[in-house]
Amino acid sequence: EQKALQLQMNPHFIFNVLNGIKALGNSGKIEELNATISKFSVLLRGILHNSRKEEITLQEEISLLKNYIELAQRMSSKSFTFTIVANLNNTDADEILIPTMLVQPFVENCVQHAFKDTTLGEVSVSFEVKHHFLYCSIIDNGIGIHEAKKRKENSIHNSVSLKVSKERLHILSPKSSFF
């Protein structure tokens, strides 16, 4: 069941990126389009490499997140900056395993929906080890989840990636420390 949910995630993510690339193509910015396609190919290669794995290292996840956010910056109509911080209490990021494609959908949701009314967006992703648990925080200076939900009620948009990710977390939570 976990694998089936993960497989739903990847096509949805790819669809979103391809729509962004299409928009760039329609704008006529050829150099930016080529750079974006190159960045997407690096990201896609990483996703495909990890697609058969149930878990990846935190270092791999951070690398994929960085590639994704850099790609999103290229495609976004709103400017935003990002930071990724790992406070791991002397633990190597290559020693920590997390489920594949678990954090990225939440960052994707933030990038796509948080900055509607913000001049310059900021995204901060942090990983911290406390009491043998890995905590992940995704913070932005956008409109806030309550306002986003209110606006979402008035639209037909349905966040498949968040729904699938929440289902994956629910499946993982009884047997592990993810939630």
What is each PLM-predicted segment?
Residues 1-179:
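Two-component histidine phosphotransfer core
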